[in-house]
């Protein structure tokens, strides 16, 4: 039957964007179309994922057709994939709309004529088998993927010919069409164009034709053809060759898979015409149709005029035809003209009417759980949690003391303040542990982070590893499509932090929204983030949101879960008072003795994907979420009371969504908290809906995890889901604790069929007789009910083994400790599981892991080989990681290395390698070359029978395929080099030659050799000797007269070419001289005169190919240097002249193209070139890598090389490496990542309650934690520095004018802590006798302005030891130890004996000194004078002053003092040993150093260590006068001195201090250590005491030595300056010190390779650190310094370089403003460039209205060696005081600029308000006679004269309304101090401007040029601008944004230039717009400098 309907599909060259936009708009009204658009994109995504990385990059990441349009418009679609797919989708979209409007259109009974050209045949094929819209959607979705494959194949075939930008086609109109064949033939002959590169006519009609060809050929054709230059030519959007019968046809089987849709039958009335046969395609199914269509697309040319003419014969005459134009097409005119000429009337059908279609089902609606991780009470993992469940463990215990002291709050009546009625809970073991370095968080910030946030980060990482998810590893793991859903219901940590004050990281650490935000930030995910608080339902709600987001396609992978950590008593008290909690212990779920719930802690995270994606991605599916529902108990009598009907409704809803019946549910994981009302209501609702008696074959099993682990509140939902999910894997239902013995009396159980298991029950599909499904309930106290249906995972398919025998196993970590531990864990796992699949192990550790900088890798063919490799690595020291990608060199092998089957293993098992080889074979066949594949693919191939052409082609094809393979795996070269013929493959790898051209030239070259050279007459002789041997040979005329050098391989290796007989004689001659040589088994003498006969033929062949510009460096082995211009002459010389490999390698090393880190990869069949490379360089074996090796399996070589690349820091594309074998591989579960953790826990303290608790002692206040085990004792104490009694002690002790905590306080804390443990805290127990040993003071403690400073004292003792180890640290920085010592139980008997012996030595010294004083030979000081002399360093209050009188030897080396111990001034003081007494009894030694008036006041002696202190505290009394004898000595040859003090009570030594070490240092160094700005100069002279004897000797002599550290430990562990050197510390040491201060890191953790970002240094911290460095050293660094030099090693190198120059000191001079001395200065921040430049004038940018230099931190580099300064407001830190006039403020900016550059010429500028200040500064400079080269004003209108009376007074609300605060709000949370400060400064600036009256510049005094830069977009919409307050906005927003002068011309004159930039006022200052802004400023500076 003839047709009267025509479908016109056009071709793929039509513009798709208008078509796509139309159907996207229409899809809002068509569910069929909406579903098709998503389904088509899904299929294309899957196909794109199969492309090579380079091909994928051209399409980019996409989730919709709109995203594909972006690829098209951004011009990244260089392969035409997006173009072809979009046109297809648009045409099918139009057909869907027409078919919805006319349902009979697709009916099998409707005759249809279908016409399409080229790619238009593909949508026509889909229509051929679709009988309705539903079928069309299904088939077309599949065909969208086929389109993608076709586009990729077109591109691949074309790129093998030419990889060059440009179009592959143009059209010609007019009479010239008939002459085209003649024109093309003439052009080809004239240009010697080889056949494969020729232009050809693909589509022709009588009036126009389309010519296709390589872009460079078409360009040359159009340039050289006079006829074409005069014709109407249109360049077409063609991305490759189609209709190209002269090219090798692709394997069409690769384009069509085994989809069942291919079996669909072609409709009987459907006629699809072939454009080459001009008849309907034959066949009965889509499978038959597609290969014919492919042939028409790829090979056959077509004539549309003839096609349309023939089409008319299939149409019904005499009836109006309906012509459906399915998307725009240029063929419409031609078709209509043809039809009209044949006498048809045509009705054109274009825009189909819209009908609302019925909704289609969108996918399965199921979501897979593919990974999980968690921590639970008593369990650090999910597996450990499961074991607890199986063992019936019930884990409640008393609240640990490290949370809070439960006894302080326990009150069973519940009436007390914050009282708790129960002290029980279920707790995690170590909630404070966190690997801060792993997540780039400084210790300081980590302490502020909620422990739930920290542990969730750990859990997410573990869950991702469990799931095998790495960013961008698959379509579903696109980082832009991963969302995070976290449930959190607690603010405990924020409440805990409040008494300690607000730190700058408290916001992001404790505000709950930062948990998902931090996860996305760290893992670089762009999906949505949600933090959910629905009380106990928080994590269930989070999982529910994640489920819905996946089903709704809002994301493709979701992370869901949350945490519950108990840190304060507040909620314990609230829940106690509310009657929720059990007073007797754990949750007694379903039990008769249930009395409330027991609070619990938990962390849980799951990873989710849509089920279809999980299956496609080869994931391990733990469970499937079939449906989810949530409702609210609206009708309950109380908000917290459960409601049975509401629960029943949520069950019905979730079953309906899942399509299940109640009997399908075999298990319910109940909410089951153990509250009577809750359990009863839940059981009743479950029985009513799911478990009525008589309606079930088997009882419904129920259980609840809370009976074991407590109610983890916000985390309870995720805990229940994880337990339920793992039951599918384990195949067991665990027993319920306390059942059946204590089962409660629930009435509903009598009428229900319910089983609560008391023992484990098998839970398999077989055990229950059907597929397992279960329900998980989660209810919350606020009335919400959540319910999930979980289903068992699909049964895994049995997989064939991986054909690769060798594999790579990798291990990586963020730090060395974690790496070693990960290796140990993996080794143990492999020893325990030796039977696992090596392939699965390799796949899991490579393709399914996130990889870090610290790496190890192992290759092998067995698990044992991997274990042996790990053992070898663990037995030796680790090497530092490679922080940066090393340079990669591809070295291509030359001839002679081939062998049969050289790529056989790869050819057999790697589809990608095989496809490249077969494709190259087809190309060669099209040129008439013989087949060569068997030389690569078959080991048994008779290689000796192969021709030279076959061997050369096989070698180059192998190398091209290997190069492509390595690139696909992520290994791309930075440099290529090829030996001899290998250079052709190198030129391909560099982009100089296309694959087709390379194969063509190599084939023609070999053919010419065969045709023109005689085999066997000539040969090649390889010679190996010393360099002297080679030199002698080359100078020997007997040798060189008959041959020539073919290859110079190394100083001792050459190859000679010549006639065979001559070479035999030379061989004999050399062997007689004991020189190694051998004749090579080659038939010709390459690179010799034998090649003369092929020169012209080769030149002619090469002239027809395109030589591109190298994309990577090419080292020519012809020229021996890097070369960039290649042509036919080069290839001729390359064939004829010698290979200069030696010089080429030498050039690489001498010109820095390679270094010791470079990786050399040989691309070829054997590692021949590597030997030559190593003989020319010192390349180590681990850097010389090969692809293949004769005798080794291909995969052995490749896996070993990949392992080396991985260890060297290369980013391997592991998914690509395993792609061909995905169906053979499975993800396996491996040991968890070994985090390198530190404890960041802080015990809760409550200010008011602390004052009520009696401190342990005056110096040691509270016990935080105590742990006693059989082997050891450990305790943690704290002391509040701000406590009045302790603060009084500290304030009485000043060091050089600065209050510093005395060492005696540290000793007292240590003694008290030890005493507490020994006496169990009893104040009545007798004092133990204790010694203090090895006291070290590393960091001073200085009280801060606030009173929240807390010291933490840690004490440990082994039960077998009598020694306690004590460390003292500021609790805010627990990693920085201030002091440490050992406290030892004293052996009284030994001590008595020792002090008697001591007395015998000391008494004669005392007597001698006393006699000297009596004879006037020693100094006698009374107490007051003693302390006046000591005031040189120490300033004591009276409580410390115990010395009554002192006798000091004349040389100040020994002294004797009488000491009266100070009496206590407060009855509340309590001690073990008073710090006042310790100091009074021992500071005599310090006096001998620092009280000596003859010592220079520039130096001081500081105590740093005390070896031993023995004081019998119980014997001391304030009523006794003691004698103290002291002497000092110098350590030999050092700045270290030692002091000793002995304390006597009559004839009894009651104590002594031995080995007190002091370091001599400059006083200025001490001031820097203590943070003192200026040293205190003593203006009062202390009178020299007169004596009857000789004058006091000179000060102690110093004798430098290198035995001791050069810096005292108090200097924060930073290596500083020696005392005899300059006072100035090194810049690097100050930087490290500031890093430690800001981040809280320990110095030992800072390694040279540490990245600043990894330890939490952000832009704000960076500015703070650099400001401190400037303050201490006077050196000013770029604000971007820590970004420019991102590691410590980088920074150290640059700082050392800078220290070779003069540093720039900040200006100290004052400035006069209005006659008054200015007390403020502007901070001038160096943003870019050197601090001084002799060649370039600096640029000064004045800060905007917010006052901060941070506005300019995103600026790109504005010029080479150009100093760029930002001038900050003087009021940036206290904007409230910014009340001066505009003129006064400008004068301050002027002074700051002149302090840096006293005289001009100047370059000034500023953004926003900074531009106005810059104007005024420029005016003032010009008035002073200075020259201003340029004034740069960024987006601010000229401050024109306005009627100020009209201007409203600025307020915060008004400036917010006009948009001035939006920039701050974009970057800062409004709650931060910084945000408020910046906003206040903005208001102060506007207020200042409101009073200004700008003065125009004087005539003749203008900048050389003024540049004004405008943002094109308004901050606010136009409508909003119209409503702004009158007047004020006029200064900032022009009345009409004309992007011109806008008032500036009235002030600066007419010499102005204007620029404009996309973006608004604020966005232009950040990426990406700031890049363009930087370019404009660079251009402006370039014009004036």
UniProtKB/Swiss-Prot annotation:
Residues 1622-1699 form the Carrier domain. Residues 1261-1392 are annotated as: N-terminal hotdog fold. Pfam families: Acyl_transf_1, CurL-like_PKS_C, ketoacyl-synt, Ketoacyl-synt_C, PP-binding, SAT, Thioesterase. Its EC number is 2.3.1.-. Residues 7-243 are annotated as: N-terminal acylcarrier protein transacylase (SAT) domain. It is an enzyme of class 2 (transferase). Residues 1719-1913 are annotated as: Thioesterase (TE) domain. Residues 1261-1567 form the PKS/mFAS DH domain. InterPro entries: AB_hydrolase_fold, Ac_transferase_dom_sf, ACP-like_sf, Acyl_transferase_dom, Acyl_Trfase/lysoPLipase, Ketoacyl_synth_C, Ketoacyl_synth_N, Malonyl_transacylase_ACP-bd. Residues 1265-1566 are annotated as: Product template (PT) domain. Residues 364-792 form the Ketosynthase family 3 (KS3) domain. The modification O-(pantetheine 4'-phosphoryl)serine is found at residue 1659. Pathway: Secondary metabolite biosynthesis; terpenoid biosynthesis. Non-reducing polyketide synthase; part of the gene cluster that mediates the biosynthesis of the meroterpenoids nectripenoids A and B, as well as cochliquninone D and isocochliquninone E. The pathway probably begins with the HR-PKS ntnH that catalyzes two chain-extension steps to form a reduced triketide, which then primes the SAT domain in the NR-PKS ntnG to initiate three more cycles of extension to give a linear hexaketide corresponding to the polyketide part of nectripenoids. This is Non-reducing polyketide synthase ntnG. It comes from Nectria sp. The gene is ntnG.
